[in-house]
């Protein structure tokens, strides 16, 4: 089992962890319907960048 040679100070420990933070996912609002969705993903009703790309089940 590995054993540290010297204790890492709280400051150095914090600097080591500085890149471990999680980012908030990018949320976009569809301009035509006003629904929110993840960026670069279609909205739940099948609209992407103002265009209907998937047919709704009620329309099919």
From Swiss-Prot:
Residues 1-60 are annotated as: Disordered. It comes from the Bacteria. One of its GO terms (molecular function) is structural constituent of ribosome. GO terms for cellular component: large ribosomal subunit. One of its GO terms (biological process) is translation. Residues 9-19 have a biased composition (Basic residues). Keywords: Ribonucleoprotein, Ribosomal protein. Belongs to the bacterial ribosomal protein bL32 family. PANTHER family: 50S RIBOSOMAL PROTEIN L32, LARGE RIBOSOMAL SUBUNIT PROTEIN BL32. This is Large ribosomal subunit protein bL32. It comes from Delftia acidovorans (strain DSM 14801 / SPH-1). The lineage of its organism: Bacteria, Pseudomonadati, Pseudomonadota, Betaproteobacteria, Burkholderiales. The gene is rpmF.
